[in-house]
């Protein structure tokens, strides 16, 4: 009976650690996705003014 309890306790402990690691990995993946969206916004902010200046130069002349 004691060995069964130890085995179950060990399985529970390992399962808890595994679940914790999966949650951390999922959170890290979500952060990476957020970073990509922020980079896209930064690229758009840099890209649109340049196009505006080019069109202004072409249409202004």
From Swiss-Prot:
Modified sites of kind Leucine amide: 59
One GO biological process term: innate immune response
Signal peptide limits: 1-22
InterPro entries: Frog_antimicrobial_propeptide (IPR004275)
Propeptide span(s): 23-44
Tissue/organ expression: Expressed by the skin glands.
Functional description taken from the UniProt entry: Amphipathic alpha-helical antimicrobial peptide with activity against Gram-positive bacteria (M.luteus), Gram-negative bacteria (E.coli), and fungi (S.cerevisiae). Stimulates insulin release from pancreatic beta-cells in a dose-dependent manner, without increasing intracellular calcium. Does not protects BRIN-BD11 beta-cells against cytokine-induced apoptosis. In vivo, intraperitoneal injection together with a glucose load into mice improves glucose tolerance with a concomitant increase in insulin secretion.
Name listed for the protein in its UniProt record: Temporin-1Tg
Lineage start: Eukaryota, Metazoa, Chordata, Craniata, Vertebrata
